Amino acid sequence: MSEEWYARPVLFVAHIDRTLDFYVNRLGFAQAWRYEENGKAVVAQVDRQGCVLIFSSQWPDKVGKGLMFISLNVNVAQGQFGAEVESALDKLRVEFETKGVDVKDGWWGYRLLVVCDPDGNELYFNYPEADEARVAEEAQ
C-alpha cells in the first residue's frame, strides 16, 4: 500500500469573508470551500498551484500570528537558474502590487517576498533551492 501525505496549514483570521477577498482577488488563490455556522463563515480553504491554506476564525486569540513559507518551483534550463528565479520573483511582485498588495523584500538565506494578510499573518514567497543551484552552477 502506498500512502501520500499532504499538509493543509491553518491561518487564524478575524473575518473569513475579508480574508477570502484578499487571497482570492489579490493573491490569485481559488476558494475551494467554506463552512458556515448560523449563517457566518467560520472556516474556509483556498488553493493556488498546489498550495492549500485553511482559514479559521474559531480561535480569536491566535489571529495574526501565522507565518507561512510558500515555495515556488521554477523549471529552467541548466545555467539559467539565477536569472529565471529573479524574473519569476519580480513577476510575482508585479502581479501582487498591481492588485494593491504591499510587498516587501525579505531574506532567509535567500531572497524572498514578504506579504502580510489583513490579519497580520506573514506569507514568505521564496525559492529556497536558489542558492543551492547557484552554488552548483558556480562549481562547474
Q: Where would I find each of the regions flagged by the language model?
A:
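Core segments of cupin and vicinal oxygen chelate
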Residues: 11-53
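Short acidic/glycine-enriched loop/turn segments that link adjacent beta-strands
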Residues: 38-42, 63-64, 107-111
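Vicinal oxygen chelate
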Residues: 13-17, 69-122
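Short, charged/polar surface micro-motifs in flexible loops or helix N-caps
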Residues: 49-53, 60-62, 75-79
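N-terminal beta-strand motif that seeds the catalytic metal site of vicinal oxygen chelate
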Residues: 1-20, 68-72, 127-140
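Conserved beta-strand in the GNAT
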Residues: 53-57, 114, 123-126
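Acetyl-CoA-dependent GNAT
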Residues: 56-62, 93, 100, 105-106, ...
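Active-site beta-strand termini and strand-to-loop segments that position acidic
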Residues: 45-49, 115-118, 128
